[in-house]
Amino acid sequence: TALSIGASGLPVQVHGIGSATRDRAGMTPELYLRWLTAGVFSSNFAFQGVDGLMPWDFGEETLAHAKTWMQWRYRLVPYVLGAIEDSARTGLPVQRSMAMSFPNDPHAHDWDLQYLLGPALLVAPVTEPGKQVRVYLPKGEAWWDLNTGHRYEGGTTWTIDCELGQFPVFGREGHMLCLGPAAQHTGEFNSARILDEVWMFGMPVHNPVVMRNKIRVMQMQGSSYIKGLEGLRISPSEGLEVKRRGAEVRISRAR
């Protein structure tokens, strides 16, 4: 698996959506879409490029969801490439097992399908049919549901609603997620403006992981002062307010 390979020293892997060499009779639209969304929140993936394993082969609803998730993948490119740069510096894989990421939380080690994508996102792949999934969020930290914006305390197993248009991904409190603009292909990327928006999971504490990172976070008197967010949309967590002053952004508790 990607997590085992990553733990063996190979930081980035690629996997194909579906299995081109096996009987596709069991490939339902739900299974295909869950597989695709798992690929979107992985280090790298590819379509098989064969009849019967492309998004339009599974109906209009699946195709519509697939388009949405592919837009998400393009928006994640700055973060994923930043995680790859981080791997080159630290040796940590882009997809990090729970045991590797949370060595002091023995319960986390039992959840061997969940993983961190980079340092900021916890991904819980949906591996069974249905619209709910059980997720363990590691103790000692808080986690923000990317689908709903709800904040969860760690150290507990939660049952999360997960419709076909949703996927269980959680932002790690204290981190930021830097997103690029939506695109149809990488040729539309503007190398001079790779970022479009920043999502904050609680009060920012850590410098974000993002390609060519020039964003810096400094804490002072209960607030975070951030440089490098000029021209970007900022989506703070509930209870925080944003104030811009020249090239600096101040994040503080709402009064």
PLM segments and residue spans:
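Surface-exposed interaction regions enriched in Ser/Thr/Asp/Glu
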Residues: 247-255
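Catalytic core of carbohydrate-active enzymes
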Residues: 5-15, 20-238, 245-246
